[in-house]
Amino acid sequence: FFSYQLNWMYWRYFMWNFAGRQNDLQGSGEIEHGNWITGIKFIDNMLVGNQDLLPKELKENKGHNVFYCLPLLLGIIGLLWQAYRGQKGIQQFWVVFFLFFMTGIAIVLYLNQTPSQPRERDYAYAGSFYAFAIWIGMGVAGIIRLLQHYAKMKELPAAAIVSVACLFVPIQMASQTWDDHDRSGRYVARDFGQNYLMSLQETGNPIIYTNGDNDTFPLWYNQETEGFRTDARTCNLSYLQTDWYIDQMKRPAYDSPSLPITWDRMEYVEGTNEYVPVRPEYKKSIDALYAEAEKQALSGNTEALVNVKKEFGENPYELKNILKYWIRSKNEDLKVIPTDSIVMKVDKEAVRRSGMMIPGDSIPDYMHISLKGKRALYKSELMMLEMLAEANWERPIYIAVSVGPENQLNMGNHFIQEGLTYRFTPFDTDKLGVKIDSEKMYDNLMHKFKFGGIDKPGIYIDENAMLSLIHISEP
């Protein structure tokens, strides 16, 4: 609590604003990333070591800001001056203090943050920093009163001298932070959002799966505000676990038809099908059941075979049958996935019409989806399987390159990259050794993609913008 939640996740952010910041790189406790500093060399050496030994790119990072603790000192002076101004002063002090506490440390207690946050959380405590800024303003008044009391100066000269002297504090802060807050000429979020959408096939009302904020909100902005690629549908996998979002996905939006989800609402409402266990151990019993039924059929008794196929389908491990007879079964005992290797029959004509690249010289009869290592599939993953089965290669389905393997349903071996997206295909692209549609990739990179002005000298490239570039340079 004290070392991480208070020190690292609150006081570090506090000191960024009133003492100084090492750089704008997200830190996880490293001595060279995201610490607070002062600009006073001997203090910084004690805090984070000799900063002169850092590599050039860290020393010249635009997020390197030093305030020499001047705002901090002014705030402490203002805090003390307010608290020791008699009864009225202490009453005012407690008002500001509780504003400071309730928007700062109280939020730390409430959030109970775990390690390895996906991003810096300084924005959560902005109210606390505003409260401290009140004390900074009072610090100026406090110094004026001190000069009047101890130096016997008149109010006007004291106010003039202190105001001019303290004016250097915001000037210093502005001069340090201007370059890493200047977004002029930079359109990375908008352009990279368009790049994701431009990576999609131009026909067929494509679907793109996203997962985080940075690969979702720019797409929504472009579609909803700029009217760009409104024929495509952005589907956030984080939200796809909820019934209200599935409701939205089942409705048309702009020029995009609804997503291919046939489930009734009662099948995905909150509390229903939140997850379905993967039980490959069932396979042995099912195989034995089919073998016995086929054996009886050879003897002329086809009733058992007809019944078992009526219960579980022609192939009990085929995707549509698993969805129909197992996952969506009314029998709670059958709400499992009885294999860790699902097969999906491939409509070859649909694949030929789809517009996807066809590596090799043939289209497989079946696509194999491995669930090895998975103990269950969650609602969002079930929806992905449902859409894959219902789309039948007639509606292109993509996943953003920024989505991690843990959210790819173990289907990375079926992806072909066409830009900033991977396209779902029926091919085992790992075995074929073809992971990129080079023609579409080249066309996207050289003729369609925009880069938000980051090619211009002096444009501020923060960590998020750099990560967007990495997704292009290191697919």
Where are the model-predicted features located?
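ER/secretory pathway lumenal C-terminal domains and tails of membrane proteins involved
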Residues: F1-Y125, F132-N205, F217-L469, S473-P475
